């Protein structure tokens, strides 16, 4: 090695540097070489002491020193500004997934609103996402933030290029990396003082302070949620750009409003949509905790997802507005986030406070997006507070959170339990649908109970709200070639909504074990198979022929009699269970504490010979005709379902005969009882009926058989008489019981009547007194009627 040291000086310097890197034990050379080696080690560590070394060239500077020199040189600031965020980490450091796409090369003449709407239109089919526009020094870019990496990858694969204003825009993925502390995402949910403190980093006072010393590093994806919250606790789909068309700010330091991904790099490019004044006071020291918007509006950052918020609605309340603000100004600002149906501004008398407004959007998704983006932002001179307004019930409801997994069959199956569905509007693949009910009560129950329901799985929960009634006249209904009878004049009425079933639904699961085989097809609606992608309109007066051999629990698709099945739906809360079916009741069920003479006859201390003889006679009855012969007919009349009247007669098998005269009449005093609701034969609901029987002051159980038309008296010319077997067949096919609310206006006594088709539960009720009944003997069409005093349906 000595021969090399005797060579030229330049050779000696080169050899000495390499030797020092290989071994720290080599003896130091001359002073000039030692100085050079110290500079080399300093560059290797990336240490910056704030002073340059004469003779340093850019080729010998570390990347960290290059970055800091760019920070101190405004003229060289623009080029690397967005590069780390757009390109992400080097390929070796890139993780497998990304959630953000960067769209660059945007045409300068395209307005921001046009770009946003174009991106929403192009990417809405790939999943939930938000769009943010960032204005760099030399260009404008858009960031599309998806909820999941899978959605982002699919969107990138199918849309690698976009055409905007006849110009090709470039789509690049933004990789998540935790290795670079300078990646500083900044969400709009961060407090304004952070924005102001951020701008101080560019002042002369903060130039020499490294970025990492001014603020600790945070998760690169922290902007997807509110402060102090896990980044995945809030869905990114709820965030859109935080800007309005404010006038250009005065010359001077930029006042950024936040919410754009270019905060990742420790730079604050000017923003043309800045507010007219800072959002919060400038802090006195870098570590001083300043006053934030959250102190003024404590809950403005706390945004509950609509599927979890019972107060969510498409109407927003906007408070703290200028008294002189115009309708057009509010419509322009709020219109950025969706279609605004109506704006109502309330202006107090001068000097009594600020104005406020109610803004009604077309649907809940739009309203929630606006609530997220505008709450706490400046509208005019004042900082605005956004909340939900008052719910406006209607017969038409909106369902959000849908997707390619949703079908009309599924919607009809889940929503028909709340009442008569008039129409379903859904286009395959769309994220929303509309369902129109016959009554406001049915729609109210559906909106309340189906909010947050996981229709497409645990991660796909429904959003529900009321919607405007369409102005167009519904299309003409489909007519079957062989209807059993005309139901064109069917009417549907429902009683007032009853909170009792709201409470009973709380402990009823939405799913469960079904002892019956799965029902095939479209729940008996096989005629709807094979629909295309066009808008589907579901009407309630569709006629299809009945299936004479339909049985309860059958897996065949069997339509009910006379098109009634499409018009008659479940009452609110009567069963929100999914998949469960009726099962055999266990023996020894608790019996009612009724004043029934028959019950006293079975009691040990009873001395009623008549009741005892009747009980003994029923005990030997083995068929339906036997029961009819051995029981007296205590009620004759008709059951009415829409425009169909079914003559019937009831034979008392157990309970209190006083119920007949006190409750079993209509408003005019006639024995015509109208079925308005239905109860699904699910175990939780049947248990609820059993509890009502046991806890009521009195009850009665009847066997219902076909009656004579001579015993009916109905003045409604639109009502047509049908045989009772049609109603029995319908209830069997629907696996449901008819429900009637009973009311005596004179005594204000109330009660509920249940009409059960032949099933395990109804058989068990009959066997309370008719112990010898067999399955063979119950094949004849009949109903089991249960009347419970007290309560409402």
From Swiss-Prot:
GO terms for molecular function: mRNA binding; RNA binding. It is found in: Nucleus. It comes from the Eukaryota. Residues 624-791 form the SPOC domain. Residues 314-391, 395-469 form the RRM domain. Residues 257-268, 526-536 have a biased composition (Basic residues). Gene3D superfamilies: 2.40.290.10, 3.30.70.330. Widely expressed. Shows some enrichment in the central nervous system. GO terms for biological process: cell differentiation; compound eye development; mRNA splicing, via spliceosome; negative regulation of stem cell differentiation; positive regulation of canonical Wnt signaling pathway; positive regulation of gene expression; regulation of alternative mRNA splicing, via spliceosome; sex differentiation. Phosphorylated by Hipk at Ser-23, Ser-25 and/or Ser-27; the precise position if phosphorylation sites is unknown. GO terms for cellular component: nucleus; precatalytic spliceosome; RNA N6-methyladenosine methyltransferase complex. Disruption phenotype: Female flies show stem cell tumors in the female germ line as well as female-to-male somatic transformations. Its main location: nucleus. Residues 25-42 have a biased composition (Low complexity). Residues 1-93, 243-296, 507-623 are annotated as: Disordered. Keywords: Developmental protein, Differentiation, mRNA processing, mRNA splicing, Nucleus, Phosphoprotein, RNA-binding, Sexual differentiation. Residues 285-296, 566-593 have a biased composition (Basic and acidic residues). PANTHER family: RNA RECOGNITION MOTIF-CONTAINING. Component of the WMM complex, a N6-methyltransferase complex composed of a catalytic subcomplex, named MAC, and of an associated subcomplex, named MACOM. The MAC subcomplex is composed of Ime4/Mettl3 and Mettl14. The MACOM subcomplex is composed of fl(2)d, Flacc/Xio, Hakai, vir, and, in some cases of nito. Interacts with Sxl. Interacts with Hipk; leading to phosphorylation. RNA-binding protein that acts as an associated component of the WMM complex, a complex that mediates N6-methyladenosine (m6A) methylation of mRNAs. M6a modification plays a role in the efficiency of mRNA splicing and is required for sex determination. In the WMM complex, may act by binding target RNAs and recruiting the WMM complex. Required for sex determination and dosage compensation via Sxl alternative splicing: m6A methylation acts as a key regulator of Sxl pre-mRNA and promotes female-specific alternative splicing of Sxl, which determines female physiognomy. Belongs to the RRM Spen family. This is RNA-binding protein spenito. The lineage of its organism: Eukaryota, Metazoa, Ecdysozoa, Arthropoda, Hexapoda.
């Amino acid at each position: 090695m000595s021969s090399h040291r005797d060579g030229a000086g330049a050779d000696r310097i080169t050899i000495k540097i390499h030797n020092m890197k290989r071994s720290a034990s080599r003896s130091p050379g001359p002073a000039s070489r030692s100085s050079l080696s110290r500079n080399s080690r300093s560059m290797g560590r990336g240490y910056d002491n704030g002073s340059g070394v004469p003779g340093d060239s850019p080729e010998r500077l570390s990347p960290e020193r290059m970055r800091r020199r760019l920070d101190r040189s405004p003229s060289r600031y623009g080029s690397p500004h967005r590069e780390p965020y757009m390109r992400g980490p080097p390929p070796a450091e890139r993780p497998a997934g990304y959630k953000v796409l960067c769209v660059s090369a945007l045409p300068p003449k395209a307005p921001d609103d046009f770009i946003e709407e174009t991106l929403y239109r192009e990417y809405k089919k790939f999943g939930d996402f938000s769009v943010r526009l960032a204005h760099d020094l030399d260009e404008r870019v858009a960031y599309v933030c998806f909820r999941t990496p899978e959605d982002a990858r699919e969107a990138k694969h199918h849309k690698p290029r976009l055409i905007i204003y006849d110009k090709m825009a470039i789509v690049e993925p933004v990789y998540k990396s935790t290795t670079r502390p300078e990646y500083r995402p900044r969400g709009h949910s961060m407090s304004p003082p952070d924005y102001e403190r951020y701008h101080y980093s560019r002042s002369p006072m903060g130039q020499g302070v490294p970025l990492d010393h001014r603020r600790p590093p945070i998760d690169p994806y922290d902007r997807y949620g509110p402060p102090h919250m896990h980044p995945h606790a809030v869905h990114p789909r709820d965030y859109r750009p935080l800007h309005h068309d404010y006038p250009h700010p005065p010359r001077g330091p930029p006042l950024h409003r936040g919410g754009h991904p270019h905060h990742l790099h420790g730079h604050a490019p000017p923003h043309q949509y800045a507010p007219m004044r800072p959002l919060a006071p400038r802090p006195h020291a870098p570590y001083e905790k300043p006053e934030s918007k959250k102190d003024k509006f404590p809950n403005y950052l706390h945004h509950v997802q609509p599927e979890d918020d019972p107060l969510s609605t498409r109407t927003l309340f906007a408070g703290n507005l200028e008294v002189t603000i115009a309708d057009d100004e509010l419509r322009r600002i709020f219109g950025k986030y969706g279609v605004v149906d109506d704006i109502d501004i309330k202006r107090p008398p001068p000097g009594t406070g600020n104005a406020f407004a109610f803004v009604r959007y077309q649907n809940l998704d739009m309203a929630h997006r606006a609530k997220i983006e505008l709450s706490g932002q400046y509208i005019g001179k004042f900082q605005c507070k956004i909340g939900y307004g008052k719910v406006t019930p209607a017969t038409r409801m909106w369902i959000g959170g849908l997707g390619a997994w949703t079908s009309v069959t599924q919607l009809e199956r889940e929503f028909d339990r709340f009442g008569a569905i008039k129409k379903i509007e859904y286009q395959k693949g769309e994220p929303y649908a509309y369902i129109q009910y016959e009554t406001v009560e049915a729609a109210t129950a559906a909106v309340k109970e189906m909010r947050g329901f996981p229709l497409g799985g645990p991660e796909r929960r429904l959003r529900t709200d009321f919607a405007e009634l369409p102005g167009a006249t519904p299309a003409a209904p489909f007519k079957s070639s062989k209807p059993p009878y005309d139901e064109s004049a069917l009417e549907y009425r429902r009683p007032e909504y009853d909170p009792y079933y709201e409470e009973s639904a709380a402990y009823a699961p939405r799913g469960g074990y079904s002892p019956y085989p799965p029902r095939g097809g479209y729940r008996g609606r096989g005629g709807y198979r094979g629909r295309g992608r066009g808008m589907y309109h579901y009407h309630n007066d569709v006629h299809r022929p009945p299936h004479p051999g339909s049985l309860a629990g059958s897996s065949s698709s069997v339509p009910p009699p006379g098109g009634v099945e499409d018009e008659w739906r479940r009452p609110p809360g009567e069963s929100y269970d999914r998949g469960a079916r009726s099962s055999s009741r266990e023996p020894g069920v608790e019996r009612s504490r009724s004043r029934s003479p028959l019950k006293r006859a079975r009691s040990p201390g009873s001395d009623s010979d008549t009741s005892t003889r009747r009980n003994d006679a029923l005990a030997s009855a083995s068929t339906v005709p036997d029961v009819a012969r051995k029981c007296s007919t205590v009620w004759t009349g008709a059951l009415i379902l829409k425009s169909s009247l079914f003559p019937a007669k009831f034979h008392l098998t157990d309970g209190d005969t006083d119920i007949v005269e006190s409750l079993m009449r209509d408003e005019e005093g006639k024995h015509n009882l109208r079925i308005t609701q239905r109860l699904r034969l699910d175990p939780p609901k049947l248990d609820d009926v059993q509890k009502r029987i046991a806890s009521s002051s009195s009850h009665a159980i009847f066997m219902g058989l076909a009656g004579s038309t001579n015993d009916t008296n109905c003045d409604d010319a639109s009502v047509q008489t049908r045989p009772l077997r049609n109603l029995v067949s319908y209830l069997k096919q629907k696996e449901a019981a008819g429900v009637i609310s009973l009311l005596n206006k004179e005594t204000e006594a109330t009660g509920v009547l249940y009409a059960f088709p032949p099933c395990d539960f109804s058989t068990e009720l009959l066997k309370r007194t008719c112990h010898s009944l067999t399955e063979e003997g119950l094949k004849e069409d009949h109903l089991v009627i249960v009347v419970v005093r007290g309560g409402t349906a």
